[in-house]
Amino acid sequence: MKPPALTPRLLLRAYALGIFPMAESRDDPEIHWIDPRHRGIFPLDGFHISRSLARRIRRMDWRVSVDEDFAATVEACADREETWINPTIFRLYVELHALGHAHSLEVREGETLVGGVYGVTLGRAFFGESMFSHRTDASKVALAFLIDRLRAGGFTLFDTQFLTPHLASLGAIEIRRSDYHQRLTVALEGNASFTPEGYWADPASVVQRNSQTS
């Protein structure tokens, strides 16, 4: 029997169960479903902004945008020697974006995309999928603005899937699968907005709000 066709709705059901898709490589057509024993998350009140990053944000001449070019952000995340984003996964995330369940936050130098992050939203959970940086600290800037936005929008869970040394240095932690599923259940019971009404994110305010909570 053929497995059911992979659709955006099926993908959202998987996220609600705490599993996510990955491919072995760009050229691997097979999709693997992952439910790690230990899960990386970002406590939304625990993002670490170093003094150097705070200075970078306050003085930066980059522009931060939201959902201006979702597909280009995903493409930039996949543009590396090894990637888990194959054509099927790319298509699914673009379709999720069209449905309002996937969003990107971009960092631009002029009109050039130099950093960014994208993820999936469901209830009050944000599932961070991937990020990239073509300038020093561009991905850190993207994360600072993203976490500020998630807090303002009422999100309670920022799932990073795995914990890397880079994410740990910024405040991400690792929790057990059972703890993660409990947090996910609570997050799915409510609603949040990635574009909260009246929200404004100028650099100085982002630094101040993150400093107050970390």
UniProtKB/Swiss-Prot annotation:
Functions in the N-end rule pathway of protein degradation where it conjugates Leu, Phe and, less efficiently, Met from aminoacyl-tRNAs to the N-termini of proteins containing an N-terminal arginine or lysine. This is Leucyl/phenylalanyl-tRNA--protein transferase. It is found in: Cytoplasm. The lineage of its organism: Bacteria, Pseudomonadati, Pseudomonadota, Alphaproteobacteria, Rhodobacterales. InterPro entries: Acyl_CoA_acyltransferase, Leu/Phe-tRNA_Trfase, Leu/Phe-tRNA_Trfase_C. It comes from the Bacteria. The gene is aat. SUPFAM superfamilies: Acyl-CoA N-acyltransferases (Nat). One of its GO terms (biological process) is protein catabolic process. HAMAP family: Leu_Phe_trans. It catalyses: N-terminal L-lysyl-[protein] + L-leucyl-tRNA(Leu) = N-terminal L-leucyl-L-lysyl-[protein] + tRNA(Leu) + H(+); N-terminal L-arginyl-[protein] + L-leucyl-tRNA(Leu) = N-terminal L-leucyl-L-arginyl-[protein] + tRNA(Leu) + H(+); L-phenylalanyl-tRNA(Phe) + an N-terminal L-alpha-aminoacyl-[protein] = an N-terminal L-phenylalanyl-L-alpha-aminoacyl-[protein] + tRNA(Phe). GO terms for molecular function: leucyl-tRNA--protein transferase activity.
